[in-house]
């Protein structure tokens, strides 16, 4: 997973609240067996509207989504994070996230930055007045900078550390590979193993 420190990208104002995971990626796309290639599924129903924000310049090149409250509610879908990331988003800003979505985001390398609704509305106003406005998201300082305005955001320390280190669940496990190997060596041979014992050909 790519480490996250500072990201600069075009802000996209999504003035919708209670955006659930079925709106982020409809269930029909969950039948795919690949891990990537979900960018076409992101907000699929809404993108059929030519006036939807992601169908307009310069927002179709945005990488920082500024959404309404209660983003990512509904069923738990890692695919929701994958679709946002595959489209190009590195950050989602909202005043409230569903707990499961926030957890999936951190594991998938997507920053879910929580800030006050007043600050979200300030960003909406600035972005709409200056289409193409680039936001600078600094995970080290937990700030979002828009022009001369610097706004704080919240993220728990553990998820912040994982993103800064670029560690997904597999990466976390591999950091302990030496300890795991030593444990396996010291494990009594009479105990069950994950690999079958070799069969003698005699």
From Swiss-Prot:
Its EC number is 4.2.1.33. Pathway: Amino-acid biosynthesis; L-leucine biosynthesis; L-leucine from 3-methyl-2-oxobutanoate: step 2/4. It catalyses: (2R,3S)-3-isopropylmalate = (2S)-2-isopropylmalate. It holds the Pfam family Aconitase_C. It is an enzyme of class 4 (lyase). The keyword DNA damage does not apply. One of its GO terms (biological process) is L-leucine biosynthetic process. It comes from the Bacteria. PANTHER family: 3-ISOPROPYLMALATE DEHYDRATASE SMALL SUBUNIT, 3-ISOPROPYLMALATE DEHYDRATASE SMALL SUBUNIT 2-RELATED-RELATED. This is 3-isopropylmalate dehydratase small subunit.
